[in-house]
Structure formats: C-alpha cells, structure tokens
From Swiss-Prot:
It comes from Eremothecium gossypii (strain ATCC 10895 / CBS 109.51 / FGSC 9923 / NRRL Y-1056) (Yeast). Residues 147-166 are annotated as: Disordered. It is found in: Nucleus. GO terms for cellular component: mRNA cleavage and polyadenylation specificity factor complex; nucleus. Belongs to the CFT1 family. This is Protein CFT1. Gene3D superfamilies: YVTN repeat-like/Quinoprotein amine dehydrogenase. One of its GO terms (molecular function) is RNA binding. It comes from the Eukaryota.
Length: 1305
C-alpha cells in the first residue's frame, strides 16, 4: 500500500530530432528525457525556448518525425519493448492526439527464442515509405502513406488495387504491419547487432550487421572473425527481400551501421569500415593499436589516434559539396571528423581525424546519447545530449576552414587509384603521418541542465547552516537539503536539492508595528516606504534614502488603515486609499484632493491613471486621474449590467485577449487595459474604458475547465453566490522569453495556471504540468489558508525573472525558466505577511514577527528552477588535482559537514596480492584503465575542501557512511564515526581484497583567513581484509562490513581496536545492506535478499526471512508503515519490488518466506535508496495509549537523473486513491495511447504480487487536481459520499511528505 512519485523529473536527454511538428513557421527541436517529451524552438541567439511539454506514461526509446503533406510531421514514438505511437499535434487542445497505435512486443516475445531486450530501436526509411522497429532478432515494418503526393498515391493504387481498397476502407495514414524474425529476411541472420535503412537506392534497402556465431577476444583465435554484414532490398508490398551482397569475416568489435549518401560506415571499437551500396568493402581506418589488420581492403593507419568507439556511438552525418561529412563522438565527448569522397564508385577520400576543440567546451561532458541539427559549410548548429553533463546547443564557428584543411590532408594520402585494388583484390596497408589540425571553435549557445547519473544521496544542512543572515534569523532556518553525487569523469559534481527557494538576503530591518508595506518609487528610485498596521489602525512613512528615518507628512492619513498606496500621474502624484476614502498628494505628500466614502473599501487596484475600488457590499467604483492638471479623480461610467452583479474582486490588467471583439483592434496584438472582475458566482468579466455597455466573460472558469475562451457576457437567469475565486492575475512569466499566463488563486488556497494560446489570444489552456498542490476546496486543507491571508503579487523583475509571489503562512513563488514549464515552489521557511517591490530586481518581505528582509533570487552555482525542486550544482575544484567521478556522499551531523568519496581514472597497475608487479607485466604497453580513490571533507558554508585522504592505486570506495558507534558496552555511550569500505580492483585471476577505515572528525585550529577549515579527519582504525567490500552498514551500535559473500559484524573496543562478533554467509555476492534498529536486510547479486535480526547477548545474526524470487538485487531499503515491516528492492531489470514480513500469513511459513506484494517498473536504473522521516501534514499518527509512531518514506535516485520517493499509505487512503487511479486511467485520454497501468505493472512478477494492491503512481493521481470541478466530483463520488475532501487530503499528504526536511525533529 504505497505510492510512487518522481520528485525530480529525468534530466538525461536520450532522444532528439528536428523538424516541424507544432508549427511550420520555424524549425523545432523535439527531445525526450526518459518519459518527458519536450518541444523547443531556438531564438535568434540560439537559446532554447520551451513551446510544449508532456509527461508520458512510458519510457521513450526512439523518436522519428514522419513527413506529412499538411506540412506538420507526425511523430512516431517508440516505447516499451516494441510499441509505436504515431501522434499529431492538436492545436485546438494544445495536446497530442494519437492517430495510430501499434503493439509489437507480444509478437516479438512469441517469435524470439530468447528474452526480448528492453531497448528496441526505431528507424525511418529515407524516403519515408515505412518505419522499422527491431528488437534483437525480431523486426516489424510499418508502411507509411501520409507523406505521399496525389500523383504517387494514384500510381501506387493502380499497381496495388488491394492496397487502395484497404486505404479507402479505414482512411489510415499507415498500412498493415509486418512482424517477422530477422531470419525471414535471410536464413543466416542471427544475433543482430544493428539494422539500418540505407540511402541512395531506388527501393527500400536495409543493412544488417549480425554475428551468427558469438565470439569474443577470449576465443577469437578459435572462432576467428564471425561478424557479417548483409544488404537486402525490401519489397514492402509483397513482403519479400533480395540479397544485394554479403560481407563475411568482419571484425567482431563492429556494432553500428551509419548510413551515408552512397554507402555506409560500419563503426566498431577499433576500426571504421566503408561499404558502398553494392556491398563492396572499399576501405578501412584503424583507430588504435588493437585494430584488425587482416581485412581484405586498403587500410589507413590512424592508430595514433588511440580512439575507441564504444557502443552506443553518437554520430551526425551530412553532405556538402558532394562529400559525406561524418561527426563522431566517443565516450569522453571527444569529437572526430570523417570525410568520405567518391567519384562514381571509386572511393577517393576516407579519413578520420580528431578535432582539436580550443575552448574545451565538452570538458564536463561524457557519454553522448543523441545528436541532431543542421550543418553546412557556412554555419553549423547541433544539439547534443549527454548521459553525464548538460545537454548543449552548440554552433560550429570555423567549420568551413576546418573542413577545407582536412580535404588537403586527405588528398596527400592517395597513392594508388587502381580500381581493382580499391575493391580488395590486391589490398595493401598504407601508413602516413597525419598533419596537425587547425583549432576548431565550438560556441555553446544554450544548455539543458542534467544531473544524471545520480549515484548517491545524503540528507543534511546546506542552506540552513548559518543561523543568522543579515543579523536576522535565516529565512531557511531548520531546513535540510538533499545532496547528491552526480555525473561521471571531470564533469562530476554535487547537486543540492532544496525543498524551498533559498533567497539571497541583501538587507534586513526590524519593525514594531506593521501588517502591510508599499514602496513608492520617485523618478525611478526608492523614495518612501509606507507601512500600515490594521490592528492598531495606523499608517507611517519612512524615507528610504535617509536610512529609513520617519518622514513627517502633515497631510498623510496616519490614524487610518491604508488599503493601498502608489505613485500615479506619470510619477508626479501619490494616492493613498484608506478604508474610508481616497487622498491625492504630490510627491512631497502635500494634499491635493480627498474623497470620503460611506462604505468600507476592501480591495484596491491602482494602475496609472486609473483607480479601481471594491467595497464590502460587492460594488465597484472606477476613477481616472484628470489628465491635464492631475489634481483630482474623475468617476468613470460603468456598464449597466454591473449593477446586477455582485463583485468579489477587481483588478486592472493588460492583455490583447479581447482585441478580436473590439472594433478597430481585430488584427492588433497590442495589449489593452481591461477592467477585470470576479463575480460571486465565479465568473470573470472584462470591459474596456470605451466599453459601450459591452462586457466580455471568460467561459468555463467557474468549473475550471481545461479550455477557456472569451465571449460576450450574458447575465444568467439565476445567480447562486458561492465565491471560490479570490484573485486573478494575467501576467507574463519567464526569464529572457516571457509568455502570458492566467493565474487564479482561490479561497481554499488552490492555484490554477492557464497559458494563453499563441495563435488564438482569446483562448487559454490549463497547465497540468504537475504543479505543486497549494490548497484544496471544501476547506479540506485549512492549514494552508489560516493565520495569514494569501495574496498574490506580480513582480515583473525579480533578478531577471518575471514571477508571482503568494504571501501567507506558507508563501509560494511561481517561476518559469525559458526551457521549462512554470513551477510553484515554497518560498523560504518563514511566514510572509506582506511584500513590495524593491530596487531594480528585489523584493522586501515582512514576516509574522515584524522582520523585514530585502531579498533577491539566488542564481549562484548554476541554480535552476525548471524542475520540480530547486537545483544547484557544486563543482569541487582543486588547482592541483582533478577528482573526476564523485561516487558516494554522507553527512556528519555532529560537525555539520559532508564527506564525499571520489574515484579518478589512472593507468591500471598490475600488482599481485603482495603488491608486486605481475609476471609478464610490461609498462610500455597500452594500459587498461584503473581507479584511485579518496575521501574529501567539505564545509557546506562555502563548499570548500577542508581535508582530504587519498588511498593507493587500484583502490575503489564502494560505500561509506557515518554511524553512531557504541564505544562502551557498559555505559552505552556512542559517537559518530565515518566508516569507509574500500576494494582493490585487480585482475580476474587474483582473489579479491579490500579494506575498511574508521575515522573520527575532530575540531582543530582553522587556517588563517579560512574559518571553515576547523575540522580534520582522525584515523581511528583500519584493516585489510580478504574479499571485496561492496557495502557498509550500522547495526545496533556496531557496523557490518561485506566481504564478497560474507557479512561480518564488528564491534569497537575501548582501546579503539575493532573485533568481529558475528557473521553470515550469503549465496553469491553482497550488493547492498540496510538496517532499522536491530533489524537488517542484505541483498545478494543473484539470489534476492535476506531479512535478519541481530542480537548482542550473545552476539548472533538470525535469519528471519528470505525472498523467494531470485532477484538480481541492486539496492534495498526498509519501508516501515504503522508498525508493519515492508522492504523495497530494486533489481538489474529496472524493477522495484515490495515485499513484506508477515509471519501470520499461512503461505509465509511463519515469516520465513517474505510475501511478495507488488513489482513496479522503473524507467531507469536505480542507484541508491535512503529511508527518511515522512511529514504528516494532517497531524501525527498515534497508535495506542497516545504513543507517537513516526512515519517514514524512502527516497531514491536513478541513472537518468530522476529522484523519486515511495510513500506508505493507510488502508483507507489506499482504497480511495486506488479507485481514483483506476478512474483516471479508464476515463481520461492517455497521451500516445499508452496505458499507465501496463507501463508500470507489466513484468514477469505481476502474478506473484497482490493484483488488486499494486503500487500507485502519483503522476497519474495528481491529474485529479487538474480536472474540472464536475469531473472531479463525479470521480470522487465513486469512492464514497464524502470522499471528495478526503481525496484532497490524501493528495496533499503525499505532496508534502518531504516537508519533513523543513523541520528539525
């Protein structure tokens, strides 16, 4: 009974294509990040701007943009093990519409003798005649028709009348699929490595790289080279294939086919081969010293490159001036240029050179995943995604000169032009020295932040490490942050995940009496600060430029509550509105006019030169400042229909959404002033100054429908006053590129966001991008709106961003990055009563204890606000050393420091168990890569390195944790120590060895000028042991060290020596271990995991239960729910399993067999899990006699940058949410036609779990909050009569489970 939620969306870009999908006006970039599909466009400066984004239910393995005669392509999306969705952009609803859905995975499993792979591939035929899906030795061909011109269609229909009848019958854009094993194409095809369509042929042709007899370097001398390449011509109508040619005896390291204009390149780890479209091997390039020299063709020796092209290979191919230009990127993001030039069938140029990039732009990037763009000799623009490092949009500045230079180099390599020799009859090996390449300049135009792969997590103080900021309490006091190790190689870094926004405090003030503040700017400078205290009915003025001294103004209404005040009249007048009147002053507060009212003013909007008042009776008044002398306000005539309407809120907005209904402005895009009002029956109405008694309304807003549109207002026959809309703002949100949004704040604290359609300014579409739930209807979440009133404030320039603040007990900020959707974050960890703009790009905020802080948006350390939590990157830099990969992190609570382990790559040193060089070791040969590890002590105040310890060569730290170790068995005294588990990486024929280290962190005298360097590592104990150390774990005041397959518990003595006290043997190899009190779970690499108990009197480890399934365990963690013990286990197949210790169940054999509850598909590899406390948003849970039972939840990380949480649920909550999830899946239209239930639960373990109690998906459940009110009520009624409010409470409790990080308990 748990729910899964992604608290950080995936950041690794795994697919990208360019083309026209949503508009024909500009080329678009379409990318996927696991299950996130984004459409972006490029501005004039090359920055990426998000146009649309959708979160899909499954992982996307491939993308292809299919041409269509409408001009807008259809997007083919490959998910699962072989599911293709063909979708188009629905401009009316701003969403994806599925045109065709094809499930091949079941057929693949039927045809395949082996388990179908989890990473299928999607290919489009160059002439867009068909799509090819292949997974292992199975393939499916899907004919396409949507791109064909009318003449082509008629010709094909004459030749194939059956096809014409089938097309006319269903009107589909695709034909009938053909699914077959690869051996159907040719009987010899087996163990397919790659399959691609070839270019430059009249008919569809496919190249297949396969290895009928598997071979590797260990048996290569016996099997020889068994790789084969075959070119087949396909007849899509008759489902036949014809062999064009077959090549045998190719190197076993080949893995990728790269189609070119008149041939293809076969890329391998050690060589590149060029094969023309007739199947003739015309040339080869050796890339390193391990390349195959026995090929029957001309070989160009480029072994000095020492390049290794591992799979998967990232490449970009284009054509210029009759030459094929191929850009390759290896695992370390080094770029290589391959030029292929031919005269007819005669290959004249085939050369590979490494491009010397002068600005080291890819220094922090590794493992490219996708590349797309456009490139010609004048300019080149590419988008490159990386597994490690930010995705980058780059410009190749001096491409033309670089390619011209490389052309000269390739010509010097031509020594023989004999035709037969080039075709391999008398091939010879040719060796030439390469000329030096000219510097290659690449300019980064924009980046998409990537924090993957995330390898380790720790929870500790980062933003709250300082108790005071600017002499006031830290606005992020008591907050804990999640700090993760991210990335590989030089680009590895720490990522800080903040649950709230961490502002930069510039100045602080202390007030005695204030409930609301205003900043009056005179001539562009902050001049006056006006405050009011409604409890004491008093207002004051302070002179800002005189260090906030009180300003004496005799005419100012001090003994009254100020509702609003602002500068008007072009900066020459100041207006003060109190609860009983309006007062007009000059800029020195000399009175010019006063208007007194016999009603109470409750809301005011001042927008030069207009003044809008809303009174307590629901009436409005609008005044305009007399334009000539600006000495009085003139009443504006209102439409007659307003007399029949009860108004709850009024505001003056600027927008062009009503222009098409206004005479003379039908084609204008200029924004107009709109007097906007919210009625008691939750309608939003507008009118202009010259209204002619014409009022407009926003249809559908009363039910918060998905689409809103403008129309002429018609007074309803019956008005049922039930106000729920509190405030309305139409504003432009963003950074460099701002977009117009409609923001609605309700009395229940809910925030709804609608985006204005670009093509139809009179229409708005609801944003359903997993926005943070801030409130609930029916008073289901009173905590959110009690105490301090929630008020929305639009800030046009908040350190460059246009944002919306919402004050209250829990304040929020709505912010949008240019390349992301809008996000809602809690703002700091304090209550905000009032706020006002300040300076150029800051705000002044007043909290509930009268403290005022001037704050601006924190943009330090690559801080990013485009994901579901605030992210910041910390690069650990040392001028003398590159730490490379950071792989583990832990937090030392006593000293409030973080410890990070690193593993840097070195040349492998072949040493024996006695640390002597192995017999036959030759230091002059090319080395394999080894590791050398160490640990770093960091201060979160400055993230500077305090202390460092480096271990010997071949060392690799697999795990380290801080633990409370018992020092004395009599006094039970404990101390926090650091335990480090280290393994020595050696040859496979040498027994594994390791070591563990015990450290204390002690306080020392800091270095001069470096107050943070006041802690150092203190060595307590260390020991070399037999067996590799893969994990360490605390257990009941002792610590467990894994030694290959043995778990050894050790105890520390009073003299700081360490002795083993208990052990347990596991079947194969220990991968992970976690403890909870005196209970422990230990995961095995092949045989699942065991549930153990530890007893100290006498010392022993008791096996309480084992998993029945033989899981290939990756990570394990406890999940405790209301006294019940559950286990979370992830395996190598990207599955998360939930098991339970239930000795009372009859099939558990008194608990010896752990009960399998459910299995849940993860879309990426899990790397780490941690148990943390759960926040109970609606009160603490007690269990008998008033005993408080703390709640827990699990957080985890994945290789694609995702951070997730698993939250346990009560029985009642699970039942109602399960019903809602079923309704959402069955009743709502799913993107790309994907079934969320199938994408998450379809796996081999489905039948083993409780089918009616699967793990819930919060991504699906959260859609409930974005539904229209009638749809929500209908769904909630299925769960019970009073279930609507309970469902909202359950959603909020899950949403705010991580708020436990904001509280020190």
């Amino acid at each position: 009974m748990n729910v899964f939620d992604e608290v950080i969306n995936a950041t690794v870009v795994n697919n990208s294509v360019t083309g026209h999908f949503t508009t024909t006006l500009r080329e678009e970039l379409i990318i996927t990040r696991t299950n996130l599909l984004s459409v972006l466009h490029k501005d004039n400066e090359g920055r990426l701007v998000l146009a649309y984004e959708w979160k899909l239910s499954g992982r996307v393995h491939g993308l292809s943009l299919v041409p269509h005669k409408s001009g807008l392509g259809r997007l083919a999306v490959l998910t699962g093990r072989g599911r293709v969705s063909i979708v188009r952009f629905d401009a009316e609803n701003q969403t994806l519409e599925t045109e065709s859905l094809h499930y091949y995975d079941a057929k693949f499993e039927e045809l395949s003798a082996l388990t179908v792979g989890a990473a299928p591939r999607l290919e489009q035929e160059p002439a867009a005649r068909c799509l090819l899906v292949h997974n292992g030795d199975c393939l499916a061909v899907l004919p396409l028709r949507g791109h064909e011109e009318e003449g082509e269609e008629a010709e094909e229909e004459e030749e194939h009348p059956a096809k014409r009848a089938r097309t006319d019958a269903d009107g589909r854009l695709v034909g009938a699929s053909t699914v077959m094993p690869a051996s159907h194409l040719h009987s010899d095809i087996k163990n397919v490595k790659d399959m691609r369509f070839l270019r430059g042929l009249n008919k569809s042709a496919v190249g297949v790289l396969y290895q009928p007899q598997l071979s590797w370097c260990g048996n290569e001398k016996l099997t020889r080279q068994t790789m084969k390449f075959i070119i087949l011509s396909l007849d899509l109508d008759d489902e036949k294939s014809t062999v064009i040619n077959m090549l045998q005896g190719l190197p076993n390291t080949l893995h990728t086919i790269i189609p070119l204009s008149n041939g293809c390149v076969l890329a391998g780890v050690n060589e590149l081969l060029y094969v023309d479209n007739t199947g003739a091997l015309q040339g080869a390039i050796s890339l390193n010293a391990f390349s195959n020299s026995g090929l029957n063709t001309r070989i160009q020796d480029n072994s000095k490159l020492q390049a290794f092209f591992e799979q998967p290979l990232c490449y970009f191919a284009t054509q210029s001036n009759g030459r094929d230009i191929l850009l390759l990127m290896d695992e370390k993001a080094r770029m290589y240029n391959v030029i292929i030039e031919a005269e007819g069938r005669l290959l004249t140029t085939f050369n590979c050179v490494q491009l010397p990039i002068v600005n080291e732009i890819f220094k922090r990037n590794m493992m490219p995943t996708s590349i797309c763009g456009n490139m010609n000799l004048e300019t080149g623009s590419l988008f490159i995604g990386f597994q490690s490092g930010d995705a980058m949009h780059v410009r190749l500045n001096n491409l033309k000169s670089s390619l011209e230079h490389k052309g000269t180099v390739s010509e010097t390599l031509e020594t023989d032009e004999d035709y037969m020799e080039l075709y391999g009859n008398n091939a010879e090996k040719e060796k030439k020295n390469l000329e030096t390449e000219s510097p290659f300049d690449i300019e980064c135009l924009d980046r998409l932040l990537n924090i993957g792969p995330v390898t380790s997590l720790a929870v500790g103080k980062a933003s709250s490490i300082e108790h005071t900021v600017a002499k006031l309490a830290n606005p992020n006091k008591d907050e804990l942050s999640i700090v993760a190790t991210s990335g590989n190689g030089t680009g590895s870094h720490l990522t800080i995940l903040e649950n709230t926004i961490v502002p930069t405090v510039q100045q602080a003030l202390k007030f005695i009496s204030v409930t609301q503040i205003w900043n009056l700017k005179i001539k562009g400078k902050d001049k006056y600060l006006v405050t009011t205290d409604s409890s004491q009915t008093r207002s004051d003025i302070y002179s800002i430029d005189r260090d906030f001294k009180p300003f004496k103004a005799a005419d100012f209404r001090k003994n009254d509550t100020t509702v609003s005040t602002a500068v008007t009249g072009g900066g020459k007048r100041i207006v003060q509105v109190t609860s009983k009147g309006v007062h007009l002053f000059d800029i020195n507060f000399k009175r010019m006019m006063t208007m007194n009212f016999d009603f109470e003013v409750v809301h005011v909007c001042i927008k030069d030169p207009f003044l809008l008042l809303t009174n307590s009776k629901g009436d409005i008044k609008i005044y305009e400042l007399e334009p000539k002398h600006k000495k009085k306000f003139v009443k504006t005539v209102l439409p007659d229909a307003l007399k029949e309407i009860i108004i709850t809120f009024g505001v003056i907005l600027e927008s062009n959404m009503c222009n098409k209904y206004i005479n003379g402005l039908e084609k204008s895009e200029e924004p107009q002033l709109l007097f906007t009002f919210v009625t008691a029956d939750n309608q939003i109405v507008f009118f202009t100054k010259d209204h002619n008694d014409r009022i407009f309304q926003l249809n559908g807003i009363d039910d918060f429908r998905q689409k809103l549109f403008i129309s002429t207002y018609q007074l309803p026959e019956d008005i049922n006053p039930d106000p729920s809309i509190k405030q309305v703002i139409i504003s432009r949100l963003g950074h460099k590129h701002k977009q117009e949004y409609l923001t609605i704040l309700t009395f229940g604290g809910e925030v709804y966001l609608y985006r204005k359609c670009i093509d139809n300014p009179d229409r708005f579409i609801k944003c359903d991008h997993e926005l943070l739930i801030t409130g609930a209807p029916e008073n289901a979440y009173p905590k959110g709106v009690q105490g301090v009133e929630r008020v929305a404030h639009y800030i046009e320039d908040y350190n460059g961003y246009s944002v919306i603040f919402i004050t209250g007990t829990v304040p929020y900020i709505i912010i949008k990055e240019d390349n992301s959707v809008p996000r809602i974050f809690p703002f700091a960890n304090i209550t905000l009563v009032s706020m006002t703009r300040w300076g150029e790009n800051s705000v002044m905020c007043v909290d509930d204890v009268k403290n005022a802080r001037i704050m601006t948006l924190n943009l330090d350390r690559d801080r990013y606000y485009g994901n579901k939590m605030s992210l910041a990157k910390i690069y650990l830099e040392d001028p003398l050393e590159d730490f490379q990969t950071l792989n583990n992190i832990t937090y030392h609570e006593r000293t409030q420091t973080f410890i990070v382990s690193y593993a840097k790559s070195i040349d492998y040193v072949a040493l024996s168990e006695e640390d002597e060089p192995l017999v036959g070791y030759n230091p002059d040969k090319i080395h394999a890569m080894g590791f050398q590890s160490g640990i770093i002590l960091l201060s979160p105040k400055s993230w500077e390195i305090i202390d460092k310890i480096e271990y010997g060569k071949n060392s690799l730290i697999n795990d380290m944790r801080t633990m409370m170790i018992q020092l004395n068995s009599n006094t039970k005294r404990r101390r926090e120590y650091l335990v480090v588990g280290n393994t020595y990486v050696r040859d496979e024929d040498i027994g594994g060895t390791g070591s563990f280290y015990l450290y204390d962190i002690t306080e020392v005298v800091p270095e001069p000028g470096k107050p943070d360097t006041n802690y150092k590592f203190k060595d307590i104990f260390q020991e070399d042991i037999r067996g590799t150390v893969s994990t360490v774990c605390e257990i009941s005041g002792r610590f467990m060290i894994s030694q290959s397959s043995k778990a050894m518990v050790r105890d520390i003595q009073e003299d700081n020596s360490v002795v083993p006290v208990a052990f347990l043997d596991m079947p194969v190899f220990i991968t992970d271990a976690k403890s909870f009190g005196n209970l422990m779970i230990i995961g095995d690499s092949m045989q699942g995991f065991s549930f153990l108990g530890f007893d100290a009197e006498p010392y022993r480890m008791l096996t309480l239960g084992k998993s029945v399934s033989k899981l290939e365990t990756m990570c394990v963690e406890f999940l405790v729910n209301n006294g019940d013990v559950y286990f979370l286990v992830t395996d190598r197949n990207n599955l998360m399993h939930v098991l339970k210790y239930a000795p009372d169940e009859p099939n558990s054999l008194s608990g010896q067999r752990l009960v399998h509850c459910t299995s849940f598909n993860l879309h990426s590899t899990n790397t780490c899990m941690r148990l943390i406390k759960k926040n109970d948003e609606f009160g603490k849970v007690s269990r008998g006699f008033g005993i408080y039972m703390p709640s827990f939840q699990c957080i985890g990380s994945q290789a694609d940058g995702t951070i997730f949480k698993v939250v346990p649920l009560s029985e009642a909550s699970y039942r109602s949410l399960y019903l809602i999830q079923q309704q959402l899946i069955d009743k709502e239209v799913q993107l790309c036609g994907l079934n969320p239930r199938m994408e998450r639960l379809e796996n081999p373990f489905y039948q083993m779990g409780h089918i009616l109690r699967p793990m819930l998906d919060f991504t699906v459940l959260k859609r409930f909050a974005t539904l229209s009110i009638p749809t929500r009520m209908t769904m909630a009624s299925k769960a019970g009569r009073q279930a609507h409010a309970e469902i909202w409470r359950d959603l909020i409790d899950i949403e705010y489970s991580l708020t436990s990080l904001n509280k020190i308990t």
